[in-house]
């Protein structure tokens, strides 16, 4: 069950053994999101959506690199992050923090382009807001502006930078304020109103 590595892998070329598979990332993400909490192997496997065997094997490997601590408690084992770990603090934690802040960074970039007087409101909606996006999902963006040509231009500029920075695309909908108000009872607009994130401008509810 324990995986044995050459000692030089712990001080030199070891990243592929820590970050090289989905199970390891899943467990590290859970432990990071619930930092300070201890898990049993079974509990950690459940939250990480892994089998007990896969979770146990992965935890053993993480302990070998000093990233987690395993403490026997009765017949069970309790797992927690090793806060003193170099690998955790210098590599794993910054990576997970950057992942967690990706959406906020994307919103800031959008705001840089759309935070102007001619944009009445801009919001993102859809699968990204719900946390259900897939690899090929676009960023659904609703822009309200009474200057369609201007809005189209700034959205195109934002889309280009979003693509080069995040490797994803914007799927925009551009309405005038009047058009948005007239479509307020439309199923799509009602869906957007129920679940969106304001990027800049006036909150949608105030525009109905």
Task: Please provide the spans of the model-predicted regions.
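Catalytic core of pol beta-like nucleotidyltransferases
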Residues: 2-118, 130-136, 148-208
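Short gly/ser-rich loop at a beta-strand->alpha-helix junction or flexible surface loop bordering the NTP-binding
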Residues: 119-129, 143
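A structural signal for short, well-ordered beta-strand segments
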Residues: 124, 141, 170-172
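Short acidic, glycine/proline-enriched helix-loop-strand junctions
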Residues: 137-144
